[in-house]
């Protein structure tokens, strides 16, 4: 009964057009102060302890790094490098767009930032080359979603924050720890590269089928020049992932390092940003960070309410007693997350749903790391379909296309992503191969 009241109130508030963060906060406070006896000082304490986790500090740093890279000319040089490598294949610039998105995803941690950085440069070039605008928009909208799967990923940090500290037990009754940010980052490498390959194949196949243009093959000298110019940006991938794996720094420290590195190469190496531009980038990053931290704060309260009412535990008991197998549970989770993607953005979905679904998943024997990657892939799909697919709106602003037209344009790649979602869901080895290899 408590669950029905809580979710009914939350949905009712969201249907009024109220921001999700405020809807969460009002739902929690209304329920706590009218239907429970929880002391107000406990609620206040939970607000503060919920956002003092060390991992949360990674979010503003990755946002800052992504903003420096977006405005600092790194994307342009990555596109030139990708074009020099694959521009002569079928769909040349389209393939270069997929690869450039994958490379930029590995330094930004954000899908919208990837779409803006790569799309604003390569989409006009594709139209000038003779590609249909719909083709270019489909490539960049979906490939930009790699920004939250290829590490570093802000959504992975959200999942780790949402599930950290939870006391959950596996099917044998033994306690199971939640996934760390480092484990999730390493787990995202193989799925991220695989999805990039799937999207690249879809792009190549459609370009070959419809006879879209390709560029002349670049010489070795041109490729070397393009690589040398992009090397400073590419080194950030080594700094973040290599530093975490080598144990030089934690994911949060890696985020801070990436922000400093991105500032340095944008201002002093590539010089596409001046010191006068830095306050504007800092303010933009602060605005986005504040918005996410406000959502996190209210989501922490919501998770506290769920735990206080015993909803995740009751859901787990019901599913186990009903004889629900792990693969049936994952079907339900995928449908639930894809449906949630129709009216909520990824950060809110992860912060609300992960604390509820995570204990049930662990109870059914599903690995926390694998479950996290599956949720992230679901969020990728949600960012590319209406009505609130964030990548669609970002791409719409770049291409000046309507959302309906863009929705039709992305379907071939969206179907590829759905097929990949099924693969990731039922082949855990894809997510767990690298963490297991590294002994994590």
From Swiss-Prot:
Keyword Transport: yes
The organism's place on the tree of life at top rank: Bacteria
Cellular component aspect of the GO annotation: membrane; plasma membrane
Entry keyword set: Cell inner membrane, Cell membrane, Membrane, Transmembrane, Transmembrane helix, Transport
Cited InterPro entries: DctM (IPR010656), TRAP_DctM (IPR004681)
Transmembrane segments: 4-24, 54-74, 89-109, 112-132, 148-168, 181-201, 230-250, 255-275, 291-311, 318-338, 349-369, 370-390, 410-430
Main location: membrane
Membrane topology: Multi-pass membrane protein
Function: Part of the tripartite ATP-independent periplasmic (TRAP) transport system DctPQM involved in C4-dicarboxylates uptake.
Subunit annotation: The complex comprises the extracytoplasmic solute receptor protein DctP, and the two transmembrane proteins DctQ and DctM.
Family (UniProt): Belongs to the TRAP transporter large permease family.
PANTHER family to which the protein is assigned, alphabetical: C4-DICARBOXYLATE TRAP TRANSPORTER LARGE PERMEASE PROTEIN DCTM, SIALIC ACID TRAP TRANSPORTER PERMEASE PROTEIN SIAT-RELATED
Listed name of the protein: C4-dicarboxylate TRAP transporter large permease protein DctM
Species whose genome carries this gene: Rhodobacter capsulatus
């Amino acid at each position: 009964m408590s669950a029905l009241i809580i979710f009914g109130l939350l949905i009712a508030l969201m249907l009024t057009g109220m921001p999700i963060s405020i809807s969460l906060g009002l739902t929690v406070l209304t329920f706590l102060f009218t239907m429970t006896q929880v002391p107000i000082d406990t609620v206040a304490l939970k607000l503060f302890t919920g956002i003092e986790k060390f991992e949360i500090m990674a979010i503003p740093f990755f946002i800052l790094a992504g903003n420096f890279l977006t405005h600092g000319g790194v994307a342009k040089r990555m596109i030139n490098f990708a074009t020099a490598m694959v521009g002569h294949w079928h769909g040349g610039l389209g393939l270069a767009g997929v690869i450039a998105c994958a490379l930029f995803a590995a330094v930004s941690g954000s899908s919208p930032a990837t779409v803006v950085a790569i799309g604003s440069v390569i989409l006009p070039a594709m139209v000038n080359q003779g590609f249909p605008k719909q083709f270019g928009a489909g490539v960049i909208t979906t490939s930009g979603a790699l920004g939250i799967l290829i590490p570093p990923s802000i959504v992975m940090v959200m999942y780790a924050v949402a599930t950290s500290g939870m006391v959950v037990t596996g099917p044998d009754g033994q306690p199971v720890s939640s996934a760390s940010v480092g484990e999730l980052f390493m787990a995202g490498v193989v799925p991220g590269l695989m999805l990039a390959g799937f999207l690249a194949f879809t792009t190549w196949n459609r370009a070959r089928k419809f006879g879209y243009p390709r560029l002349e093959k670049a010489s070795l000298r041109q490729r070397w020049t393009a690589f040398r110019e992009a090397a400073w940006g590419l080194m950030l991938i080594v700094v973040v992932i290599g530093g975490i794996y080598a144990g030089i720094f934690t994911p949060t420290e890696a985020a801070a390092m990436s922000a400093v590195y991105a500032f340095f190469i944008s201002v002093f190496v590539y010089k596409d940003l001046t010191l006068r531009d830095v306050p504007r980038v800092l303010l933009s990053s602060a605005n986005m960070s504040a918005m996410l931290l406000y959502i996190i704060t209210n989501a922490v309260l919501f998770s506290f309410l769920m735990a206080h009412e015993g909803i995740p535990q009751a859901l787990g008991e019901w599913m186990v007693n009903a004889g629900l197998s792990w693969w049936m549970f994952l079907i339900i989770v995928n449908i639930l997350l894809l449906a949630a993607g129709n009216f909520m953005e990824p950060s809110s979905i992860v912060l609300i749903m992960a604390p509820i679904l995570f204990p049930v998943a662990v109870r059914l024997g599903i690995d926390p790391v694998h479950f996290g990657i599956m949720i992230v892939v679901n969020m990728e799909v949600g960012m590319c379909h209406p009505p609130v697919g964030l990548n669609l709106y970002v791409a719409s602003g770049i291409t000046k296309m309507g959302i309906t037209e863009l929705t039709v344009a992305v379907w071939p790649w969206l179907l590829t992503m759905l097929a990949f979602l099924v693969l990731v869901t039922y082949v855990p080895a894809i997510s767990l191969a690298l963490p297991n290899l590294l002994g994590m």
